[in-house]
Amino acid sequence: MSLKHFIQITKPGIIFGNVLSVAGGFFLASKGHVDLAIFLAAMIGTSLVVASGCVFNNCIDRDIDLKMERTKNRVLVQGLISLEVALVYASILGVAGVALLYYVANPLAALFAVIGFVIYVGFYSLYLKRKSVHGTLVGSLSGAMPPVIGYVAVSNSFDMAALTLLVMFSLWQMPHSYAIAIFRFNDYLAASIPVLPVKRGIRVAKKHILLYILAFLVATLMLTFSGYAGMSYLAVAAAMGMYWLYMAWTGYKAVDDTVWARKLFVFSIFTITALSVMMSVDFKAPTELLLTYAH
């Protein structure tokens, strides 16, 4: 049991991805007026809650992880940290994260963190991941909470921009997750996890991927059409979304589904990273918003 093991079970890669989206939502709402204390609270608080969820997920998934090539060497599977210690660790992380959001940002930010946590740990990890083909859809809501937390930490209200972020990031999760399930197909099959590609076949999953990316593309453009983001954001969102859609379409002619799915997965990360960056720098200032609505 070492510091390295405690870091590993929080899934740092997932935390990093979520932190980027928190920043995107935060700067979109800040419109150039940054409160450093709230920014740090949103970033650190969300990171702690996400880390807590990941540790709880590791605790819950020990039996599944043992059956999957990708996860069979995880810390808890190998017994490098005891279950009891991991549960206490996860609880401390979660409480600390929610408290930081509640007291330094605002209760609304803390509420969305709790909602995301409950969906991920309670609904997805404990039950739906193992029992339902719709587990990915429900789980996608938890993955969409970080940008919303970042946004409401500043705005202290759930407005159209926050709703758009929720829809955008939920829709993004679906093709992203299905791509993983395709190139890790044998792992999911071995662990009897009823993800769409395993349960209904890869061809059906390809159709769903195409439709979700199309819906995602439309949702991303709404930030500009609703007056929250600028034209540079729109250009990047349209270009990235359309190319991702094209990549999905090529899946119907793919010679190797594993190679295709891995490329789709990698580009999904580039896409959501680019959009998080663009909404951070190409927001509409309050005066610009007034002009937008005046017209």
Swiss-Prot record:
Membrane topology: Multi-pass membrane protein
Known pathway: Porphyrin-containing compound metabolism; heme O biosynthesis; heme O from protoheme: step 1/1
Segments traversing the membrane: 9-29, 36-56, 85-105, 108-128, 135-155, 163-183, 209-229, 230-250, 263-283
Pfam families in alphabetical order: UbiA (PF01040)
Compartments (UniProt record): Cell inner membrane
Catalytic activity: heme b + (2E,6E)-farnesyl diphosphate + H2O = Fe(II)-heme o + diphosphate
Keywords, ordered alphabetically: Cell inner membrane, Cell membrane, Heme biosynthesis, Membrane, Transferase, Transmembrane, Transmembrane helix
Alphabetical list of InterPro entries matching this protein: Protohaem_IX_farnesylTrfase (IPR006369), UbiA_prenyltransferase (IPR000537), UbiA_prenylTrfase_CS (IPR030470), UbiA_sf (IPR044878)
GO molecular function ontology, one term from the record: protoheme IX farnesyltransferase activity
Coiled-coil segments: none
GO cellular component, one term: plasma membrane
Any one biological process term the GO annotation gives: heme O biosynthetic process
The keyword Membrane is annotated on this UniProt entry: yes
HAMAP family to which the protein is assigned, alphabetical: CyoE_CtaB
UniProt similarity note: Belongs to the UbiA prenyltransferase family. Protoheme IX farnesyltransferase subfamily.
Name by which UniProt lists this protein: Protoheme IX farnesyltransferase 2
Organism per entry: Pseudomonas fluorescens (strain ATCC BAA-477 / NRRL B-23932 / Pf-5)
